């Protein structure tokens, strides 16, 4: 039996619409490379607000889509009940990263300050732009520069000077007026 209390589940994708009549579903991966979602097992599905373990039976490409077959999902009707359900994995299965590399879930919620020690806000999400990732920083309600949100490129050493996950702080070389 899986003890959900001791696990931290991270969303890595989402089940999409059904495919065919034998229980296959399209899948949307939020991993860096779409196929990497299959490297992280076991999967958990968020059903009615609760993470439920599931087993992947098979997967393949169909045109440009990834499709999956889950164990005990053998017909279209059962598959339809899982459409748009989030897929999560236990953070313990993620590999350790090299220094300067971070998982997005570790950065979200961090407070961002610049070199002048100005509190720029809190990371609420991350964006992928192709050339580099971007921190989406929600400013405090009384921001001196009138900003509600800042987009700060996550360029380690160039813009991002330090990340301290223990204190949930990111220090950036970034003008607070931007």
Swiss-Prot record:
Sequence ranges assigned to domain PRC barrel in this UniProt record: 99-178
Cytoplasm is among the record's keywords: yes
Keyword Chaperone tagged: yes
Biological processes per GO annotation: ribosomal small subunit biogenesis; rRNA processing
Coiled-coil residue windows: none
Domain of life where this protein originates: Bacteria
Cellular component GO terms held in the UniProt record: cytoplasm; ribosome
GO MF term (any one): ribosome binding
InterPro entries registered for this protein in UniProt: PRC_barrel-like_sf, PRC_RimM, RimM, RimM_N, RimM_N_sf, Transl_B-barrel_sf
Pfam family, one: PRC_RimM
SUPFAM superfamilies per record: PRC-barrel domain (SSF50346), Translation proteins (SSF50447)
Compartments where found: Cytoplasm
Broad class of the protein's primary localization: cytoplasm
Keywords: Chaperone, Cytoplasm, Ribosome biogenesis, rRNA processing
Subunit structure and binding partners: Binds ribosomal protein uS19.
Functional note: An accessory protein needed during the final step in the assembly of 30S ribosomal subunit, possibly for assembly of the head region. Essential for efficient processing of 16S rRNA. May be needed both before and after RbfA during the maturation of 16S rRNA. It has affinity for free ribosomal 30S subunits but not for 70S ribosomes.
Domain remark in the UniProt entry: The PRC barrel domain binds ribosomal protein uS19.
Alphabetical list of HAMAP family matching this protein: Ribosome_mat_RimM (MF_00014)
Similarity comment: family membership: Belongs to the RimM family.
Protein name: Ribosome maturation factor RimM
Lineage: Bacteria, Pseudomonadati, Pseudomonadota, Gammaproteobacteria, Pasteurellales
């Amino acid at each position: 039996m899986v003890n959900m209390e001791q696990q931290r589940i991270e969303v890595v994708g989402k089940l999409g619409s059904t495919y065919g009549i034998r229980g296959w579903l399209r899948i949307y991966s939020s991993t860096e490379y779409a196929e990497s979602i299959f490297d992280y097992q076991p999967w958990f599905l968020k059903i009615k607000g609760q993470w439920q373990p599931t087993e992947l039976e098979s997967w393949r490409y169909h045109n440009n889509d990834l499709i999956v077959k889950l164990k005990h999902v053998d017909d279209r009707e059962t598959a339809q009940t899982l459409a748009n359900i989030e897929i999560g994995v236990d953070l313990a299965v993620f590999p350790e990263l090299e220094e300067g590399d971070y998982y997005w879930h570790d950065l979200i919620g961090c407070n961002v300050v610049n070199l002048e020690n100005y509190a720029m806000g809190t990371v609420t999400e991350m964006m992928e732009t192709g050339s580099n990732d971007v921190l989406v920083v929600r400013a405090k309600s009384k921001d001196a520069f009138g900003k509600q949100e800042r987009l700060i490129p996550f360029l380690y050493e160039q813009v991002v000077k330090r990340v301290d996950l223990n204190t949930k702080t990111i220090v950036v070389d970034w003008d607070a007026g931007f």
